[in-house]
A protein has these predicted regions:
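Single conserved hydrophobic/aromatic residue that forms the stacking wall/gate
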Residues: 1-9
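C-terminal catalytic core of tyrosine-transesterase DNA break-rejoin enzymes
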Residues: 10, 14, 111-135
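Conserved tyrosine-mediated DNA breakage-rejoining catalytic core shared by Y-recombinases
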Residues: 15, 20, 24-61
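Active-site/catalytic core of tyrosine-dependent DNA strand-transfer enzymes
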Residues: 52-102
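Catalytic tyrosine of NAD(P)H-dependent dehydrogenase/reductases that use a Tyr as the general acid/base
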Residues: 107-108, 143
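Catalytic-site neighborhood detector that most strongly recognizes the C-terminal catalytic loop/helix
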Residues: 132, 137-157
Length: 160
């Protein structure tokens, strides 16, 4: 159950959602058929977030193992199974990071990495902006760390 929850949290963070959005999700916000869920971001703005087939499998297993009736998607491991908090996720990620000799593991790094990977793979910046729930595209540009090799390839492709 613990391992399943960890995998689910890791998978959910790979969607690009904020940790604050993650902890607000309820079970019935999940649409397994469409592999998406509704999250409430900054300013309580609603948006859709998408997840892959692996995440769907992990989420279903996790929910099958749950015995509590809390509507929250992620809850504490012990009674009374209260909704997981932002600090709870952050502490757990730091612990997991230390286990594999990574310092300063933070949920926000998942968002930055996801933005960078999406752009590196050719996802249009406007779609990355929407995926991350940014109002301003400047915020998205600030998140993404541009790979110098990709700059070189793009230069050769477009300007040679």
């Amino acid at each position: 159950y613990r391992r399943q929850r960890q995998m689910c949290i890791r998978d959910r963070l790979s969607t690009g959602m904020r940790v604050g959005e993650l902890v607000k999700i309820n079970r019935d916000d999940i649409d397994f058929q469409e592999r998406q869920c509704v999250v409430f971001g900054k300013g309580n703005k609603e948006r859709e977030v998408y997840f892959n087939a692996r995440t769907k499998i992990h989420l279903k297993k996790y929910l099958e193992q749950r015995t509590d009736t809390n509507p929250a998607l992620f809850v504490s491991l012990h009674e009374p199974h209260t909704r997981l908090t932002i600090s709870g996720v952050e502490v757990r990620l730091r612990q997991l990071g230390k286990r594999v000799n990574l310092n300063k593991v933070h949920p926000h790094k998942f968002r930055r990495t996801l933005a960078t990977m999406a752009i590196d793979k050719g996802m249009p910046i406007e779609q990355v902006q929407k995926m991350l729930g940014h109002v301003k595209i400047d915020t998205t540009l600030h998140y993404a760390m541009v790979n110098q090799t990709n700059v070189k390839i793009a230069h050769r492709k477009f300007l040679n």
